[in-house]
Amino acid sequence: MGLFEERIPYKPFEYPEYYTEGWLKQAQAFWLHTEIPMSGDVKDWNEKLTASEKNLVGNILLGFAQTECAVSDYWTQKVVSWFPKHEIQQMAMMFGSQETIHAVAYSYLNETLGLENFEAFLHEPATAERFDNLVAYEGNNPEGIGKSLAIFSAFAEGVSLYSAFAVLYSFQLRNLLKGIGQQMKWSVRDESLHSKMGCHLFRHMCEENPKLLKNCEKDVLKAADTMLSAEEQYIDKMFEQGDIENLKAYD
């Protein structure tokens, strides 16, 4: 049986790595925003951060909550509907559930710091274009699914997050915003797992359909260029009020 052939019995798993390396590892890494103390971050925000640093952090956090909702929908709606294997569906639902934890956590950070204009993210050109690129790819046949999954796993769960993570983590290196820094560590762990397993699933598709890789190559490379351009615009938006103490937009 192949990845797209339905299996009614729960077991035996045909693709057990999606249980052991996907579902189980994510389940073992469970966390909630309530575990993160934020009193120090509030004090840093009110007393130590400059206006440009606050603008930088705000530009990042407002976008994160909305983006995580779209990523959750991708796992729980698209991936689950494409692959009728319990082990893959369970992994996808677990990943989607974890993305809701990220969304709640970022919303909690926003509200704690007084950043609650969530709709502003959707109307700001640089961030809106980046957001649209994450959810624009559809798939209704193996080739379309392969293109969508490769682009999503490599860029939505990979490239699109890490410049912002690096910026936020830079504050922890200055002994600032430690609560946000802790959340970044946990989020990076989760997103790295999601990207890894999504890419693994795409490669599995290519093993079962050797023509798929060649057929997807052009669109994936085009998406890479699009995401790079969108990410550069997003970085310019983050640093619109200038560089910060230990980090420059160029970096």
What are these regions (language model features)?
Residues M1-D251:
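Non-heme di-metal
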